[in-house]
A protein has these predicted regions:
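Metal-coordinating catalytic core of metallo-dependent amide/deamination hydrolases
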Residues: 1-117
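Glycine-enriched alpha-helix->loop->beta-strand junction motifs that scaffold or abut catalytic
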Residues: 2, 66-71, 107-110, 127-136, ...
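Conserved, mostly hydrophobic/aromatic
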Residues: 46, 77, 128, 135, ...
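Conserved short loop/turn motifs at secondary-structure junctions
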Residues: 47-52, 143, 197-198, 225
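Active-site environment of divalent metal-dependent phosphoester hydrolases
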Residues: 53-54, 80-83, 119-125, 143-147, ...
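His/Asp/Glu-enriched, well-ordered alpha-helical/loop segment
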Residues: 104-107, 111, 153-249
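A conserved active-site cap/scaffold subdomain adjacent to cofactor or substrate pockets
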Residues: 122-123, 129-166
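C-terminal cap of metal-dependent C-N hydrolases
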Residues: 234-285
Length: 285
């Protein structure tokens, strides 16, 4: 299956067993890029763990690698919680806010994806859109950790690319339908706490499916290969059984428009609904 992956590196505010020097980070990452990038369906992502876990020398490693490999993917964290935002400002004085630090080091590009991106503002979303970079909405992780509520409405205002993510480290599921369920709840909570609730729109089922499929593919610059059923694309998909559980069958039986059926899947479907899995058109399950 299609995959973009990378080995994270960090050297500040981290246990000694997880810390590596800038020299090690460069050598290790370069070796992995040369070994795995553009090999079959695999691509590599330069992965500076998070700005508050990086010295200036360590983050400069990512800059160097991006210059050496102009089309390489970059993945990192952005403004996941208030504490990390404050730490970045203290560690990189004079370089602006969290996103400004990444931009200063040349890491905001059309190949960059920024996980979480909760505590950012209009200026940041505008810059992300201008650079054609992407953010990854990780609702189960954000709710589990109490990090905050992602503002998909603000992302849409500036046409910033958004992908739906599970965040396996702190997320509570790898199931896409269940992750979509939590994404919907995040927008509902934003509405509850908003100064002007009428300005916050619920996450429409069509948009939810979009960020989980084609939107995610576009965020990763892979939409020429995956994300939809257009002829010529790679056929990676699942087949769902809408009668797999009594509650899903009941909910679906009362769904008339397509939007209702899609909403039923994202709210009450779970892994039991997966009937078949196809990779490159070959049935695996």
């Amino acid at each position: 299956m299609r995959m973009i992956a990378g080995s994270a590196f960090m050297d500040k505010n981290t246990p000694s067993y997880a810390s590596i020097t800038p020299e090690q980070a460069y050598a290790n990452t370069k070796e992995l890029i040369d070994r795995w990038n553009n090999k079959g369906r695999l691509n590599y992502a330069v992965t500076p763990r998070s700005a508050y876990l990086l010295s200036e020398a360590e983050i400069a490693v990512a800059t160097r690698l991006v210059k050496e490999y102009p089309n390489i993917h970059v993945q990192t964290h952005l403004a996941e919680n208030i504490e990390s935002v404050n730490m970045v400002q203290k560690m990189f004085p004079g370089k602006g806010d969290y996103l400004d630090v990444y931009n200063y080091y040349g890491l905001v590009t059309k190949h960059s994806t920024f996980a979480h991106s909760i505590w950012i503002d209009d200026k940041d979303f505008e810059l992300l859109a201008k650079k054609n970079a992407s953010v990854v909405f990780c609702p189960t992780s954000n709710l589990f950790l109490g990090s905050g509520l992602f503002n998909i409405g603000l992302a849409n205002k500036y046409h910033t690319k958004v992908a739906l993510g599970t965040d396996y480290a702190a997320g509570t599921t790898l199931s896409i339908p269940q992750t979509m369920n939590e994404a919907y709840k995040v927008t509902q909570l934003r509405k509850a706490f908003a100064k002007n609730p009428d300005d916050v729109k619920p996450l429409d089922p069509f948009e939810n499916y979009y960020i989980a499929t084609l939107g995610g593919a576009r965020a990763l610059d892979l939409d020429q290969y995956i994300g939809s059923f257009l002829p010529g694309k790679e056929a990676d998909f699942i087949v769902l059984n809408l009668q797999s559980t009594p509650i899903l069958a009941l909910r679906e039986s009362r769904s008339k428009p397509l939007k209702d059926t899609l909403f039923a899947i994202e709210i009450v479907a779970d892994d039991r609904a997966i009937e078949h899995t196809y990779i490159m058109g070959e049935k695996l399950k």
